[in-house]
Amino acid sequence: MLVGGGVNNASSGIYSIVSGGYNNTTINGCSAILGGQCNTTQHDCSFIVGSGICSTAANTTHVNCLHFSNIPTSSAGLAPGTVWNNGGVLNIA
């Protein structure tokens, strides 16, 4: 359990971390919160990047919004699970 900076942050989950931010809490194991405010991880291996988020599932990264840059325009050679742009429609290889 590690709290690295910020204000009013807490980490009670084993192998969990809160890095910066305000009023963030990790409850379950192997979870992390990176900055933001008013976040809670309540599932094992859950991760939060953003603000005002409570985890909803284990083994999941939770965010408010994602921004993609330089998305491949073909699935050729991509690993399974990779996002690619198919004429303006996002696909998963």
Give the positions of each predicted feature.
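Short, surface-exposed terminal/edge motifs of secreted or surface/virion proteins that either
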Residues: 56-57, 85-93
